[in-house]
Amino acid sequence: MINICIIKPNNYIHSLAYLEIAELLHYSILDLKKKSKITYNFIDINSKVTNIIFGAHLLNDEMINSLPGNTIIFNTEQIESINEVWKKRILLLAKKEIIFWDYSEHNLKFLLNKLDIKGKLFEIGFQKNLQRIETKEKKEVDVLFYGSMNNRREKIINNLLKKNVKVKCLFGVYGKERDDWIATSKLVLNLHFYDSKIFEIVRVFYLLINAIPVVSEIDNHTKFNNNYLEGIKKSNYENIERNIFDLLEDENERKSIGINGMNSIKKYPQINFTKSILNL
């Protein structure tokens, strides 16, 4: 049995950002004919259960001390850019010989070189169960952006608004409500937040699975380790507005990007990646 645990403090809705990646893992484990469940704030101490934790930086010290030795921490943060408190938590977890999974080879290199922690790469692929966004024929939104705001993101969005582009920004909106906005948007915009510039596959894979057109910031400094870049509209920061304008005028090209995205990730069934990392 695998217990996929999402750490969600009271009144902290942002833990729901882990739901799709947790479901990706959960459904692929079920496809392997193994037992799996998704829980919130529940650490199973049964020796026959493996706990895989999302949001481990939200664990308090008491919970960290109670973790079984076979626990797996699934990191989705860009470690180079996280705060010192989380880095200290990572070191505390490492002393307990907890296993670390990460979606990014760059993160894993940072863990090894800076914190002397060896982790395992979790590759992200296609899971049919997550094909569930039914796009609307009539699009009310030109560009959808969801996530935290900072100056570099705000600059692009404000420039689009000044050009009368219908931009919808969401923060703290997850699950079905966010999916409904995706369904009625012409495209989704992905912009780097951190200077580490790791490609945000954890944010984008769900869009690819659902054939949603994605415009993503990609430049010579972007770090990525997947084969899905052919399925998105790649843009450096300076050209991203121009590329958005062009796509908004070309419905066929938008549809083509969405289909290419889905086909690019479909080549890599998640069951194979999950089987490999679990040594099944």
Model features per residue range: what roles?
Residues 236-253:
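C-terminal "capping" alpha-helix adjacent to the active site of nucleotide-linked donor transferases
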Residues 248-280:
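A charged, aromatic-enriched C-terminal amphipathic alpha-helix characteristic of glycosyltransferases
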